[in-house]
């Protein structure tokens, strides 16, 4: 008995495999904030995939999805990049940059620079998600990232590039919120 199936209501044919379902879930979570399993189930159904609550709960667990607070203090689901069933490297450059922009808009509270360092603040529990998105975007100006619970440190390649990097990330976040 299959717990997920393609819809017959004229929607697109959707593969019924667990991997295809996981890809669809990750895609949705990376594109928009999702606050509940019922909202995610509806979004999946809108995309031609009907899933039981039990299957969805199991899928989210397998993907390592957790709820984090965005900048509006709302709990949303997030999936760490390394939890994606397909490699994040398979995403195009624009998709990686879009994910970074979206997460910056949702999670970045502040950015301060000193020389080649940038300190970013996020809601509790969100720093590693934003750091992962920044790492995946592979921005040339960033030498590396270090993330704690609610704070990230970025190291600029340029000895004086911290302020430009902080300004760039703040602009990305503001543009996403607009």
Curated annotation (Swiss-Prot):
GO terms for molecular function: arginine binding; DNA binding; DNA-binding transcription factor activity. The keyword Transcription applies. InterPro entries: Arg_repress, Arg_repress_C, Arg_repress_C_sf, Arg_repress_DNA-bd, WH-like_DNA-bd_sf, WH_DNA-bd_sf. One of its GO terms (biological process) is regulation of arginine biosynthetic process. Disulfide bonds: none annotated. SUPFAM superfamilies: C-terminal domain of arginine repressor, Winged helix' DNA-binding domain. The keyword DNA-binding applies. GO terms for cellular component: cytoplasm. It is found in: Cytoplasm. It comes from the Bacteria. HAMAP family: Arg_repressor. Regulates arginine biosynthesis genes. Belongs to the ArgR family. This is Arginine repressor. The gene is argR.
């Amino acid at each position: 008995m299959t717990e997920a199936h393609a819809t017959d209501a004229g929607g697109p044919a959707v593969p019924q495999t667990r991997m295809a379902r996981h890809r669809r879930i990750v895609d949705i979570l990376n594109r928009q904030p999702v606050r509940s399993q019922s909202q995610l189930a509806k979004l999946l159904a809108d995309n031609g995939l009907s899933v039981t609550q039990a299957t969805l709960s199991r899928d989210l667990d397998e993907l390592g999805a957790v709820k984090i607070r965005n900048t509006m203090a709302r709990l949303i689901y997030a999936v760490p990049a390394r939890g994606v069933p397909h490699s994040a490297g398979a995403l195009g450059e624009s998709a990686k940059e879009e994910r970074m922009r979206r997460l910056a808009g949702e999670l970045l509270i502040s950015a301060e620079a000193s020389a080649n360092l940038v300190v970013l603040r996020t809601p509790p529990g969100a720093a590693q998600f934003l750091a992962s998105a920044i790492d995946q975007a592979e921005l040339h100006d960033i030498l590396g990232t270090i993330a704690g619970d609610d704070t990230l440190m970025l190291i600029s390649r340029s000895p004086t590039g911290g302020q430009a990097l902080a300004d760039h990330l703040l602009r990305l976040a503001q543009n996403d919120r607009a």
